[in-house]
Amino acid sequence: MVDRKRNYKDRDNRVEWEERVVSVQRVTKVVKGGKKLSFRAVVVVGDQQGKVGVGVGKASDVSTAVRKGVTDGKKNVITVPLTSSNSIPHKINGRFGAAKLVLRPSAPGCGVIAGGAPRIVLELAGIKNILSKQLGSNSLLNNARATIDGLSNLRTFVA
């Protein structure tokens, strides 16, 4: 019988993941005795070779929240098709909640023109030349997830 957990961990160790914290927020829950304080961390993990994921972790201290976010991000990894110029194959729109995002391929040498959370997601995906525009929400988490939505809907065209 194959041990699935061992295979998952072996696969995880072979890939060199880079992780970046997008935001850490203090959140409170009102309980009978007062307010219970905890932290929410939004983390992006990627290998800069076309694999990227966004994770969220909540805990009573920041380091545990970040660690949980990294674990969650590794569970939600997507593969991004890259062109030879490290861009995306075509224009795409991403949406998550009220956050809308437009992603357009750009010429080699242009760089990553994006702001906030989408920039982190695109850099960790290994995309070097892209234009993006955020519309709608200012939420870092929703913009990161909108970026993931757009990247997951990319298609490659075979001639």
From Swiss-Prot:
Residues in S5 DRBM domain copies: 17-80
Main location: plastid
Keyword check for Ion transport: no
Subcellular location(s) of the protein: Plastid, Chloroplast
Top-level lineage group: Eukaryota
Keywords: Chloroplast, Plastid, Ribonucleoprotein, Ribosomal protein, RNA-binding, rRNA-binding
GO MF terms held by the record: rRNA binding; structural constituent of ribosome
Pfam families for this protein: Ribosomal_S5, Ribosomal_S5_C
Cysteines engaged in disulfide bonds, as pairs: none
SUPFAM superfamilies, A to Z: dsRNA-binding domain-like, Ribosomal protein S5 domain 2-like
One BP term from GO: translation
Coiled-coil intervals: none
Gene Ontology cellular-component annotations: chloroplast; small ribosomal subunit
HAMAP family linked: Ribosomal_uS5_B
Description of its domains: The N-terminal domain interacts with the head of the 30S subunit; the C-terminal domain interacts with the body and contacts protein S4. The interaction surface between S4 and S5 is involved in control of translational fidelity.
Quaternary assembly: Part of the 30S ribosomal subunit. Contacts protein S4.
PANTHER family, alphabetized: MITOCHONDRIAL RIBOSOMAL PROTEIN S5
Role according to the record: With S4 and S12 plays an important role in translational accuracy.
Homology family: Belongs to the universal ribosomal protein uS5 family.
Protein name, as recorded: Small ribosomal subunit protein uS5c
Organism this protein belongs to: Emiliania huxleyi
Gene: rps5
